[in-house]
């Protein structure tokens, strides 16, 4: 309800005030390309909560999860971007740093993600996220033009909460509380200006509370797109909170073709079937627990 959004806005405002009053030593990085870079891996000043790794001691397993299996660098194909979301994603430095600009397949050539052979042979044709990747040589930036195999043992910091997310949460919670204020517009524009790579100041104080809330909801989704390792507050959690899985389920069942380039249309390789019920929003209880306690349903 509205009262909880007011509490959320108040808590986010505490963080924002702490940053602005130099109580907390956090700030947005200047460029979005720096956020998930190796250069700022251990000195990301907008990271409020992270899990740090050194693969000489303990590694994480993220580097190969987003590569498609037919990519030259050696991928696991655990994830891929959704075409509709990619299409709606505003152009600019944020989008450029979120997705592979080009992908290298087994032929050693650079291709747009929507490339396929004639006749079609690729199992998955989809946008590819580029946030968890690490350089083929340890301690270097990832180069998407380099076909060298990437080590599966990663040591990039897993970023759970960033300051830009707090800005989005404050703006959304303010809007869902039925309000619009100068600070909410200001911090949301900080996020969008960096994403655009210029001072667009896209959002105005003339917005309605509903428009502000939806804008902040969208900005948060774009800000953390493809980064499911930040599971505390992924885009999926936003969709769950707003009860938007059902509509998206129905859209994915339709699976329409989407224009991705001149004369080229693509749709999702993974079909969605069946009839919606709210149980689809939840993971099932582990079998071992369910057989011990029949009340778990």
Range-by-range predicted roles:
Residues 1-5, 85:
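Hydrophobic alpha-helical scaffolding
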Residues 10-167, 176, 240-297:
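Elongated scaffold/linker segments in the mid-to-C-terminal portions of large proteins
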């Amino acid at each position: 309800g509205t009262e909880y959004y007011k509490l959320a806005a108040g808590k986010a405002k505490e963080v924002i005030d702490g940053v602005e009053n130099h109580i907390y030593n956090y700030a947005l990085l200047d460029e979005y390309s720096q956020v998930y870079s190796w250069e700022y891996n251990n000195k990301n000043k907008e990271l409020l909560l992270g899990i740090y790794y050194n693969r000489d001691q303990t590694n994480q397993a993220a580097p190969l999860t987003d590569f498609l299996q037919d990519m030259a660098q050696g991928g696991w194909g655990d994830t891929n971007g959704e075409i509709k979301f990619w299409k709606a994603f505003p152009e600019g430095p944020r989008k450029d740093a979120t997705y592979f600009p080009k992908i290298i397949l087994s032929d050693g050539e650079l291709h747009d993600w929507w490339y396929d052979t004639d006749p079609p042979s690729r199992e998955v044709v989809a946008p590819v996220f580029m946030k968890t990747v690490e350089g083929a040589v340890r301690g270097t930036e990832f180069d998407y033009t380099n076909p060298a195999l990437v080590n599966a043992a990663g040591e990039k910091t897993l970023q759970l909460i960033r300051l830009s997310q707090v800005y989005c949460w404050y703006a959304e919670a303010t809007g869902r509380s039925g309000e619009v204020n100068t600070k909410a517009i200001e911090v949301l524009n900080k996020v969008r200006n960096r994403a655009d790579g210029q001072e667009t100041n896209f959002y105005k104080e003339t917005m309605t509370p509903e428009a502000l809330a939806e804008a902040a909801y969208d900005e948060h989704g774009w800000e953390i797109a493809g980064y499911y390792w930040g599971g505390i507050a992924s885009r999926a959690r936003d969709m769950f909170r707003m009860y938007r899985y059902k509509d998206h389920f129905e859209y994915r069942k339709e699976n329409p073709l989407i224009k991705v380039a001149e004369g080229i249309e693509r749709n999702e390789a993974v079909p969605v079937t069946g009839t919606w019920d709210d149980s689809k929003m939840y993971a099932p209880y582990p079998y071992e627990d369910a057989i011990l306690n029949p009340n778990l349903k």
